[in-house]
Amino acid sequence: MNKFKNIAVYGGGSFGTSLASLAAQNCNNVTLFLRDEAIAKEILHNKTNIKYLGDIKLPAHLQATTNLDIIKDFELIIIAVPSYAFDDSIKLLKTHSISKDNTLLIATKGFARNPTALFSDRLKTLLPHSPTAFFAGPNLAKELAKNLPASASIASLDIDIANKIAYNLSAKIFTTNVSSDIVTLQVAGALKNIFAIKSGIDLARKQGENARATLIVAALKEIAILSQALGGMQKNSDILLEVGVVGDLVLTCYSLGSRNTKFGYELGISSDKKKFLQEYKELVEGREALKLVLDLIKKYNLHMPVISKVASCVIPYVIPAKAGIQHKAR
C-alpha cells in the first residue's frame, strides 16, 4: 500500500502535537501547523512543546510552521483543533486552496455548531470534494508523545482511504482498525466527554466502581440511540466494541487526567455549584457538547436519561431525565 509522501497536522495543542509526533514515526516529512510563532520556533529548535506536553522530546525531523500557504502541498492533513474552532478552521484552510488532492483526517471531537451537525455533514458543504476520514481512540496526548502503546479507529465512507491512513499511522506501539461507520465514531467522540462528566460526579459522590461500570453500559446504549437517529449503525453494532468507541469511552471516564472527568469531580465536591459553574474557565468539551446534544435530543425526540441527568447538573432549565420517548437500539 502507498504511503503519503508528506503529512500535515493542523492544531498545535497537546493532542495535535502528539499526533504529529505519532505521524513522524512512519513519515519523514511531517509538519505541525499552528498559530503561535514562539511554540513553532521551540518545536523547531528544541523539539519540545513545553506549554502543552512538558519536557517530552519530539522527533528530530518533525517540522513546525505558522505559514498556512504551504499546507495545500501536503497529501494528508490531520485536523486537531477544539470543536468550537472547527468551522472557522476549515473555512480558513479553504482560503489556502485545500482541495480534492488533500485527504483530511478529522481528530476533533464534538459537533459543528449553528446549526448543530456532525462534522461530516458540515464538510459536505465546506469541502465536498476532499477525501475525508475520522480518528478516535483511547489516546492521552502525553502517552502518545512518549510512544507508549495505544490504538485508534479510523472511519471513512471510502474504506480504501481508511485503510491507507491506518497503514500510514500504524506502528509497533500503535495499532489501528478501520470502519465505514463515520456517524457512530463521531457520536461516540462527542458524547464520551459528557459521560466523563457524569463519571467525575459519581466519583465525587463516592458511588463506587459498580456504578461507574454501569455508566459505561448505559453510555454505549445512548451512543447507539443517537447514532441510529443520525443514520449510523445501519449494518451492525460491531463499531461499539472498537477502540474508537468503547476504548475511548472507558479511558475518558476512568482517568482523572481527562478534563471532563476532572470537571465532573470538582463540580461534585463543590459546596456552591452555581458559583463553581460560573467561575470555571477551563475548556471542557463535554460541557460545550452538552448544549448541542440537547438540541438533537429535542429534534429527534430521543430518550437519553444519562445525558439529561448530566444536563440537570450542569445547565439550568433543561429537559428532565424522563423527557423524550424511548428510541430502542437495534
UniProtKB/Swiss-Prot annotation:
Gene that encodes it: gpsA
Broad class of where this protein is predominantly found: cytoplasm
HAMAP family: NAD_Glyc3P_dehydrog
Residues where NADPH binds: 14-15, 35, 109, 141, 259, 283, 285
A single Gene Ontology CC term: cytosol
Metabolic or biological pathway, per its Swiss-Prot or TrEMBL entry: Membrane lipid metabolism; glycerophospholipid metabolism
Organism of provenance: Rickettsia massiliae (strain Mtu5)
Protein's name in the database: Glycerol-3-phosphate dehydrogenase [NAD(P)+]
Positions contributing to sn-glycerol 3-phosphate binding: 109, 137, 192, 248, 258-260
Biological classification of the source: Bacteria, Pseudomonadati, Pseudomonadota, Alphaproteobacteria, Rickettsiales
Function: Catalyzes the reduction of the glycolytic intermediate dihydroxyacetone phosphate (DHAP) to sn-glycerol 3-phosphate (G3P), the key precursor for phospholipid synthesis.
